[in-house]
Amino acid sequence: MQKNPGWDREDSPWKVGQVNAILRKFDMKPKTICEIGCGTGDNLLHIGNEFVFAQLFGFDISPQLAPFWKENIKSNSLKNRLKFYLGDFHSLNKKKYDLILMLDVFEHVRDPFTFLEKSLTFAKYFVFHIPLDLSALSVLRNTPLLNVREKVGHLHYYTKDLALETLKDSGYEILYWNYTQASLSSPSRSLKTRMMSIPRKIFYWIHKDLGVRLLGGETLIVLAKAKGF
């Protein structure tokens, strides 16, 4: 918590906007939504304002989050349909949901394959938001990779293709994916990120995938379901 005291709360409306866009695209109106690794719970608050009939459930293992949850429940009209649970989702959860969210989650997990496989049976659909930390520039500089490991706890680094293959290898069928334009539009961009916006725009325009692999600056939003479901 000392390394990331804000828990990236300023990014929550932007991130939820990405989730809502993908759900609207597929005309999905989930009645039960669960977020694994829900952090402060802000994502669920914003999603609850979009899906006004949905029951909302959040799980996280960090005991420091309890005050945020109490604050959010007390100050928000969603308190009658919003619940938080402290502990491991796979140990505590007894429900199946219309939708599970994992927004910046499995890059923090020591064994992402087992974690993802164990989650398969708990929902019909899944939305993932995945940071794409791995690029030619980040490998050459090295510091960006060490920073996200030290400051926000990323244990695994992905390109677009590695992220999608990780999901496929864990039993998921990819229904849709898209870049989020994170380095060009997210609220918490650093000065260095803003300075890189011009070269990134140029390379993205020439060839999006190649530009991302070279200069980074992107995250991925993915809609998936269990294979064979």
Predicted regions and their residues:
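Active-site loop signature of alpha/beta-hydrolase-fold enzymes
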Residues: 64, 92, 108, 133-136
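Histidine-centered active-site/metal-ligand motif
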Residues: 108, 153-156
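Helix-to-beta-strand junctions that scaffold the AdoMet/dcAdoMet cofactor pocket
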Residues: 109-110, 123
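Short catalytic micro-motifs in class I SAM-dependent methyltransferases
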Residues: 101-108
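Conserved N-terminal segment of class I S-adenosyl-L-methionine
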Residues: 1-95, 103, 113-116, 121, ...
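Substrate-binding/catalytic lobe of Class I Rossmann-like enzymes that use SAM or dcSAM, i.e.
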Residues: 168-178
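Short, glycine-/aromatic-enriched active-site segment of Class I SAM-dependent methyltransferases
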Residues: 129-154
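Short glycine-centered segments of the SAM/dcSAM-binding site in methyltransferase folds
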Residues: 125-127
